[in-house]
Regions:
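Flexible, compositionally biased loop and terminal segments
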Residues: 1-239
Length: 239
């Protein structure tokens, strides 16, 4: 790793390639998802070691319900088990865990486990770890607008005073800084409805590596690439 690296405060990752990775090995897609969950644990620990303050991963999108039912069922089972594993990792690395997305469609037992995990880790002062489950960027914005509209109707919010900051307070990510770096694995170059509001000035890094093979070294490569970017935020800098 290069010396004197500037570490991004917030890294977001689109975990892509689990199914293709498994297929290439002659295994079912569910095997890829299981290995991908293990990779999440490894990257959480490395992010904490590197000094990354916030890590957000895209685990299950609002569109993923359209996958074959057996795959959805397997993902929900994996999610149930992961909640237990995540709590152990959180205790080890002082992680504060927060789940983004519309939880209302999730089974009650999963919602309960999520609530228990968030409550148990809310005061931890290490890595802030966000997991996007049943999450879609458009859906998040719509839900935020509905909540804000209710406040306007009740007279609690003056519509004339609404700003971008006002709406941000109703997003799933309220209180969390926007990502500095977005990593997408397996060579895909699209957002897939992830953090559409928050990625306005985020730097992108596309990794050719499928998520189950994404290692600590790959995370370091992404951060090194980030260090060579010139972030202008819409401004023109003197040459």
């Amino acid at each position: 790793m290069e010396e004197n690296l500037k570490i991004p405060n917030h890294v977001a990752i689109i975990l892509d390639g689990n199914g293709r990775w498994a297929k290439a090995k002659g295994m079912p897609r569910n095997y890829g998802h299981m290995q991908g969950a293990k990779t999440v644990e490894v990257i959480c620990e490395e992010a904490y070691r590197m000094g990354i303050q916030y890590l957000t991963v895209y685990a299950f999108s609002t569109e993923n319900w359209n996958r074959p039912q057996d795959e959805v069922d397997a993902l929900m089972k994996l999610l149930r088990n992961y909640m237990k594993t995540c709590l152990k990792t959180a205790e080890k690395n002082r992680m504060c865990v927060r789940v983004l997305g519309d939880k209302t469609r999730l089974d009650e037992d999963i919602r309960t486990r999520i609530a228990e995990l968030e409550e148990a880790t809310k005061n931890n002062d290490g890595l802030h770890f966000q997991i996007a489950i049943n999450y879609g960027g458009r859906d998040e914005i719509v839900r935020a607008v509905k909540k804000l509209s209710a406040k306007v109707q009740s007279g609690e919010v003056d519509p004339a005073g609404i700003t971008a900051d006002t709406l941000e307070g109703y997003l799933d990510t309220a209180g969390i800084p926007d990502p500095d770096l977005l990593i997408r694995t397996c060579s895909e170059q699209r957002l897939s409805n992830f953090l559409l509001w928050q990625l306005a000035y985020t730097e992108f890094y596309i990794s050719p590596v499928p998520w189950p093979d994404f290692t600590k070294e790959e995370l370091v490569k992404a951060v090194e690439a980030y260090n060579h970017r010139d972030r202008r935020y819409g401004l023109v800098k003197d040459e």
